[in-house]
């Protein structure tokens, strides 16, 4: 793997943000009944994968994907709480903690 460069971390951060945007648009689309939000969601997913493809040029795929997925889930959870009033129960919080612990383990491996 090439030496770490901040540009790859920036691409990964962009991929995470775009994934969150895609998920929020998907919720707004109401099961694709509101087509513009559905299309925006698809465009954001495509852009997220494009950014992820740039990130993996300098970050191991397993690490990049774990971080992308984990931070994407955690941030989407926060967006659901802020925008839609969605809350996690105790089991949900335990799952989130396990997810974050798994991300740390993958990064340290």
From Swiss-Prot:
Major subcellular location class: membrane
Pfam families to which the protein is assigned, alphabetical: Multi_Drug_Res
GO molecular function: amino-acid betaine transmembrane transporter activity; antiporter activity; choline transmembrane transporter activity; spermidine transmembrane transporter activity
GO biological process per UniProt: choline transport; glycine betaine transport; spermidine transmembrane transport; xenobiotic detoxification by transmembrane export across the plasma membrane
Triggers of expression: Induced by spermidine.
Disulfide bonds: none
Topology within the bilayer: Multi-pass membrane protein
Functional note: Catalyzes the excretion of spermidine. Can also confer resistance to deoxycholate and SDS.
Protein name as annotated: Spermidine export protein MdtI
Species annotation: Escherichia coli (strain K12)
Gene: mdtI
